[in-house]
Amino acid sequence: MTENNDIKMVIITGMSGAGKTVALQSFEDLGYFCVDNLPPMLLPKFIELMADSKGKMNKVALGVDLRGREFFEHLWGALDDLSERTWIIPHILFLDAKDSTLVTRYKETRRSHPLAPTGLPLKGIEIERSLLTDMKARANIVLDTSDLKPKELREKIVHLFSTETEQAFRVNVMSFGFKYGIPIDADLVFDVRFLPNPYYIPHMKPLTGLDEEVSSYVLKFNETHKFLEKLTDLITFMLPHYKREGKSQLVIAIGCTGGQHRSVTLTEYLGKHLKPEYSVHVSHRDVEKRKGH
């Protein structure tokens, strides 16, 4: 492999209950290929899979489960093998927390510690901490999550592992037709069926909001201008707060009856309004469906 095909690998390990699930979700939001609970003995095979992916797996986060002493022999061997492969850039992220915090988290979730399934969680924590001493010493980054909320842990991981491009907050604005269903991935849905409908003007019926005649018609009404003023004010207010909460993207869906005229016009307008400040993708889900409103 060449330097251009370097693979960035993060091995996530640490104390059970310290936040591995949140960490993996954070890496997934950053575009990493994530695998949870990968047994260390499978790491060499996984490395071969990455090498054969031809650049498709250039960022990988692995949640490694270390609940038995025999696992460490496989792990140390795999890590030594990684150090000899110049095309892999490995990092070990160790998540830790105070014993009292871990006990509280287990009580709150009503789960048993994996190393003390029938006993007190504190005993399992003691055993696990002893097992992971060498692993913690070998880690590139140790994060104490004792005083971190899930959102704060995500923010730390984004700060530590993302590039400037990956930190960009993405906004997807899409049009749709209610007759075909509301998009299941929409975060915000706006209904513009109250606006005058170009569909009932015969020569506009086969056109869409991408045509200037249709967009000019929809935008000429006073109610359209008032709605767009309120909509852009609302979205402009909300986006920084969504970003601060740790969301990597927001899907805004604007719907009319058939998804051809009004929603398309307003989606195009909103997308152009937001593009100077955000990374915006505009799409029209139902614009090709010519079945009428």
Curated annotation (Swiss-Prot):
The UniProt record lists the keyword Lipoprotein: no
Keyword terms of this UniProt record: ATP-binding, GTP-binding, Nucleotide-binding
Pfam families from the UniProt entry: PapZ_C, RapZ-like_N
GO molecular function, one term: ATP binding
Function: Displays ATPase and GTPase activities.
Similarity remark: Belongs to the RapZ-like family.
Protein name: Nucleotide-binding protein BA_5384/GBAA_5384/BAS5004
Organism: Bacillus anthracis
